[in-house]
């Protein structure tokens, strides 16, 4: 927690400096997020450019390949997850950890669409995993030190548990919250 994470740094390195180019970049990222959420990893790049209000050449100037756009979207999600750890850090330990887990559930919802199109061998994927685990680890440790979470729980296990529970199809939102509550409850001391 505290300070800039690697995902944010990588995003800043990718984002153009000129104001008009930065606006186009941001519009493409927002349009890409919408299109991938609606159409999956096979979303049309032409549609993304149209939604962003730019030409296809501008899209390719910013993102030479589909993978480049997907990696940037994934970096944004991971950076937001890391930022969420900082945002909840001042809450009581258990509340902070569980608030971050709620944000992690939101992240899992966008992650599946992006991971379908992401090259899992890329360095970005490996770095993002480290950023994500690094964001949750201090919150977990504080909750463990406070006696709110079992001492033998590891952040990598928590991430797998919550990701698995979040990926299942539920009858309704109430059932999803109940099952997620059971999973989080299983971590408590």
Model-derived features with residue positions:
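Hydrophobic alpha-helical connector segments
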Residues: 72, 82-109, 124, 131-133
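Basic, helix-initiating cap at the start of DNA-binding domains
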Residues: 1-42, 46-51, 68
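Short linear capping/connector segments at secondary-structure termini
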Residues: 116-124
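C-terminal peripheral helix-coil segments that are non-catalytic and often amphipathic
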Residues: 1-12, 99, 138-148, 164, ...
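Helical hydrophobic small-molecule/effector-binding pocket
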Residues: 90-117, 145-152, 170-174
């Amino acid at each position: 927690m505290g300070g800039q994470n690697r995902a944010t740094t990588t995003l800043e390195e990718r984002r153009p400096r000129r104001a008009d180019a930065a606006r186009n970049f941001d519009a493409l990222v927002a349009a890409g997020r919408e299109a991938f959420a609606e159409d999956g990893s096979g979303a049309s790049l032409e549609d993304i450019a149209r939604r962003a209000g730019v030409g296809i050449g501008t899209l390719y100037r910013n993102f030479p390949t589909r993978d480049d756009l997907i990696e940037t979207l994934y970096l944004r999600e991971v950076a937001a997850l890391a930022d969420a750890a900082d945002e909840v850090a001042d809450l009581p330990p258990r509340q902070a950890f569980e608030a971050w887990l709620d944000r992690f559930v939101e992240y899992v919802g966008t992650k599946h669409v992006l991971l379908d199109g992401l090259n899992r061998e890329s360095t970005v994927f490996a770095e993002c995993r480290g950023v994500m685990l690094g964001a949750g680890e201090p919150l977990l440790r504080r909750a463990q030190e406070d006696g709110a979470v079992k001492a033998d729980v590891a952040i990598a296990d928590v991430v797998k548990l919550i990701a698995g529970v979040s990926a299942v199809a539920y009858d309704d939102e109430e059932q999803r919250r109940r099952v997620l509550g059971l999973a989080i409850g299983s971590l408590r001391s």
